[in-house]
């Protein structure tokens, strides 16, 4: 018969009592009342915060955007097809954040920073909030370094500086994305990290852009954030913030970054869809009242940091699409008022064969020549004024039957200057090449060249300079000034190349 030993039993009970953990885990739960169109209405969730992530039974995650008296309006970050009425939901106590690391370079990710290029997971030990506050006034310094786009028309007349926000605006099919991708390609060897955010675009268009970047060797310093047209509106709305968080990671590591949002019109439309489904009151063009804040809090994250924070920079090039050239619509005027200038692309110029189709009269950079090297200021200072005067002359010349020789010469030079500003896609030019090109055009060296042959002549001149006068490029790169020596070398090269070109044409 087994003998019961009371002292042994009491010691076991005492041990159990000592090991007892009285910690109670409180989970804030709710129930789905209604689900559909990427929106769920939830009863309960009394402790939920605005913008908090909530998790559904099937693992789908949503963001609590509407906190109402009787229910909570949640936008889903997924299709939500398996969520049913009556399913349970719990709060997570977190707001949206993404992993960040150097391993993201060269990769294609979605709005949740998950890889979508089929090249396996991305290792990251750090996290950043998707929506983090912009640097304050004390944390910034004024923009003073140029960010070269490689496009003569922009770098000479509408210069962009590191830490600036410059809007690219125009109708569909006017070359907005081409300007942005050329800028990324031109950052090769400039120690600039690029982030390209594609919002609501066709998958085929995105694939073409990635192919171009790969062929030009630009993917090694670029991250592509993709949410195509068939993505849920929530993810299209989040994608730009994800891109900004990835770019900020590098900015705070004392690096220079460039981010392109292609395009913010589609993000505004996704946000409008979410807001209307959440029954928020519509305003102008049915956009919600806070659509300005949607873009301002995103674009204010672009900055040039002060020396205490490492002088890193985040330059933003948002793209906005207009309808029939109407820049006075709601979203275009909002973004124009937030940014430090705009590059306006005209469909008339594009159709006339002037590419990039930049309307110099309507485009402006509010940073101005502070974002140019001294050599560019010396050479291109009067170019914008000269083009404006020629455009005015052309409008008068339409009504005049006979023009004096001076006017005819000015109009002929205008044609050559326009030809000089034309550039093929994916062929950005180095600063010294741009300076040589502008100097040749503005000082009348193209006046004797046929308009049709200007492009060929300039291409040959740039090659001739590189091969026979490498000192010219060296002077511009090292001194960043258009010295007398550089000018003498350039004039010599122009004269030699003109002689060669004339002989070529005769043969």
Swiss-Prot record:
Pfam families reported in the protein's UniProt record: ATP-synt_ab (PF00006), ATP-synt_ab_C (PF00306), ATP-synt_ab_N (PF02874)
EC numbers, comma separated: 7.1.2.2
Residues the record lists as binding ATP: 170-177
Enzyme class: translocase
Molecular function terms from GO: ADP binding; ATP binding; proton-transporting ATP synthase activity, rotational mechanism
One annotated Gene Ontology cellular component of this protein: proton-transporting ATP synthase complex
Main subcellular location: plastid
Keywords: ATP synthesis, ATP-binding, CF(1), Chloroplast, Hydrogen ion transport, Ion transport, Membrane, Nucleotide-binding, Plastid, Thylakoid, Translocase, Transport
Entry membrane topology: Peripheral membrane protein
Subcellular location per the Swiss-Prot or TrEMBL entry: Plastid, Chloroplast thylakoid membrane
Catalytic reaction annotation: ATP + H2O + 4 H(+)(in) = ADP + phosphate + 5 H(+)(out)
Residues annotated as site: Required for activity: 363
Function of the molecule: Produces ATP from ADP in the presence of a proton gradient across the membrane. The alpha chain is a regulatory subunit.
Subunit record text: F-type ATPases have 2 components, CF(1) - the catalytic core - and CF(0) - the membrane proton channel. CF(1) has five subunits: alpha(3), beta(3), gamma(1), delta(1), epsilon(1). CF(0) has four main subunits: a, b, b' and c.
UniProt family annotation: Belongs to the ATPase alpha/beta chains family.
Stated name of the protein: ATP synthase subunit alpha, chloroplastic
Source organism per UniProt: Welwitschia mirabilis (Tree tumbo)
């Amino acid at each position: 018969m087994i003998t019961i030993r009371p002292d042994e039993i009491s010691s076991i009970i005492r041990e159990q009592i000592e090991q007892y953990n009285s910690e109670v885990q409180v989970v804030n739960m709710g129930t789905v009342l209604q689900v559909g169109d990427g929106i769920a209405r939830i009863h309960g969730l009394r402790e939920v915060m605005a913008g908090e992530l909530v998790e559904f039974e099937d693992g789908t995650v949503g963001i609590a955007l509407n906190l109402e008296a009787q229910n909570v309006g949640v936008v889903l970050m997924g299709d939500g097809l398996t969520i049913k009425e009556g399913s349970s939901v719990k709060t997570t106590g977190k707001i949206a954040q993404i992993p960040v690391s150097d391993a993201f370079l060269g990769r294609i990710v979605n709005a949740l920073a998950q890889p979508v290029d089929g090249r396996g997971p991305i290792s990251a030990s750090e996290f950043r909030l998707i929506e983090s506050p912009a640097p304050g006034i004390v944390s910034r310094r004024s923009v003073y370094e140029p960010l070269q786009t490689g496009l003569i028309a922009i770098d000479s007349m509408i210069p962009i500086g590191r830490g600036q926000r410059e809007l690219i605006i125009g109708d569909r099919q006017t070359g907005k994305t081409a300007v942005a991708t050329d800028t990324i390609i031109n950052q090769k060897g400039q120690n600039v990290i690029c982030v390209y955010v594609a919002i609501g675009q066709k998958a085929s268009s995105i694939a073409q852009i990635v192919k171009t970047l790969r062929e030009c060797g630009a993917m090694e310093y670029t991250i592509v954030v993709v949410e195509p047209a068939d993505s849920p509106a929530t993810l299209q709305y989040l994608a730009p913030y994800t891109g900004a968080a990835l770019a900020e990671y590098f900015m705070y590591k004392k690096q220079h970054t460039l981010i392109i949002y292609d395009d913010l019109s589609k993000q505004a439309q996704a946000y409008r869809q979410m807001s209307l489904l959440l029954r928020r009151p519509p305003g102008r063009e049915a956009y919600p009242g806070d659509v300005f804040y949607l873009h301002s809090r995103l674009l204010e994250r672009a900055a040039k940091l002060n020396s205490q924070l490492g002088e890193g920079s985040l330059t933003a090039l948002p793209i906005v699409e207009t309808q029939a050239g109407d820049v006075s619509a709601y979203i275009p005027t909002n973004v124009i008022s937030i940014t430090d200038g705009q590059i306006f692309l005209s469909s008339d110029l594009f159709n006339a064969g002037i590419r990039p189709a930049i309307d110099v009269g309507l485009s402006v950079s509010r940073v101005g020549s502070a974002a140019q090297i001294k050599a560019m200021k010396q050479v291109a200072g009067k170019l914008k004024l000269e083009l404006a005067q020629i455009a005015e002359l052309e409008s008068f010349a339409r009504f005049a039957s006979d023009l004096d020789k001076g006017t005819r010469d000015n109009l002929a030079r205008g044609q050559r200057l326009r030809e000089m500003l034309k550039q093929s896609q994916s062929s950005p030019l180095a600063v010294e090449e741009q300076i040589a090109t502008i100097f040749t055009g503005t000082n009348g060296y193209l006046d004797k060249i046929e308009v049709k042959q200007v492009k060929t002549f300039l291409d040959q001149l740039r090659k001739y300079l590189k091969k026979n006068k490498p000192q010219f490029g060296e002077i511009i790169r090292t001194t960043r000034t258009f010295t007398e020596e550089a000018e003498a070398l350039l004039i010599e090269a122009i004269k030699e190349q003109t002689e060669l070109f004339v002989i070529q044409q005769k043969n």
